[in-house]
Amino acid sequence: MTDIYTDGACIGNPGPGGWGVVILQENDNFFLSGGEKNTTNNRMEITAVIEGLKNVDSKDLTVYSDSTYVINTITKGWKKNKNQDLWEILEKLVSEKNVKWEWVKGHSGNEFNEKADKLAYGEAKKQ
């Protein structure tokens, strides 16, 4: 089983943004991050999940996110009026795996969510 913690950040909305991912696997843990000069927090939240899913071979995994936008769009069928380009990529990746979705409260002391948050903000500051 693989656990993926994701977070997105934006300084201003829109503005410079970043995403961070913490991937926990049985024998290997690693971090990913990136950013964009002009984006939104929601785009960075979705991008974090996409990058996490793209970088694991495991078919059985749990994605943890503090974004109700991401979690509720995936699990409750919220309308995808914006960010269609990213939702299409995410839906394709999800269709290839068995993904369990878990919301985690942001800034609540969860070690891995906090690390993903630091990665995301670090990237946003670099832009």
Residue ranges and their predicted role:
Residues M1-R43, K54-K59, K118, G122, ...:
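RNase H-like nuclease fold core
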Residues D3-P16, I50-K115, L119:
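RNase H catalytic domain
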Residues M44-A48:
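Catalytic-loop motifs flanking and including active-site residues across diverse enzymes
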